């Protein structure tokens, strides 16, 4: 059976692993998922991730989750905004701080995938992929 929303599946795997207090979770690989994981690491929502070869053509990503001192996941909220059935686009002038700059928007622009803060700085709009805090 084919997957209709691979990014949504990745977010669900990360969300469920965090709630179950797992240290890592395995996510099927793709270029867009790698870009999203890079931004999650840069923003401090995950510790790290590494590429795991499944075979010569496929790779997965092993995501190392991050927790606070009380063993609560750093990622409190991970919401898929734009889905294959309902695309959500935003202009650069409409990008606002999410949750008083505690959260992050991830936007797919013509210059690549970036945070909402960077997209606003570069005056680029695009498709809102997800929001997290």
Swiss-Prot record:
Example GO molecular function: structural constituent of ribosome
InterPro entries xref list: Ribosomal_uS8 (IPR000630), Ribosomal_uS8_CS (IPR047863), Ribosomal_uS8_sf (IPR035987)
A GO cellular-component term linked to this record: ribonucleoprotein complex
Keyword Transferase part of the UniProt annotation: no
GO biological process assignments: translation
Keyword entries, A-Z: Ribonucleoprotein, Ribosomal protein, RNA-binding, rRNA-binding
Family, per entry: Belongs to the universal ribosomal protein uS8 family.
Function as written in the Swiss-Prot or TrEMBL entry: One of the primary rRNA binding proteins, it binds directly to 16S rRNA central domain where it helps coordinate assembly of the platform of the 30S subunit.
Protein name: Small ribosomal subunit protein uS8
Organism: Leptospira borgpetersenii serovar Hardjo-bovis (strain JB197)
């Amino acid at each position: 059976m084919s997957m209709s929303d691979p990014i949504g599946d990745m977010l669900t795997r990360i969300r469920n692993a965090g709630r179950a207090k797992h240290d890592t979770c395995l996510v099927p690989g793709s270029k867009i998922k790698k870009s999203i994981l890079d931004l999650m690491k840069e923003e401090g929502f995950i510790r790290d991730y590494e590429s795991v070869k499944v075979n010569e053509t496929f790779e997965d990503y092993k995501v190392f989750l991050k927790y606070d001192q009380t063993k609560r996941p750093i990622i409190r909220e991970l919401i898929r905004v734009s889905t294959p059935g309902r695309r959500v686009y935003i202009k650069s002038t409409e990008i606002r701080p999410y949750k008083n700059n505690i959260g992050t928007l991830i936007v797919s622009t013509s210059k690549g995938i970036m945070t909402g803060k960077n997209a606003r700085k570069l005056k680029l709009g695009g498709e809102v992929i997800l929001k997290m805090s």
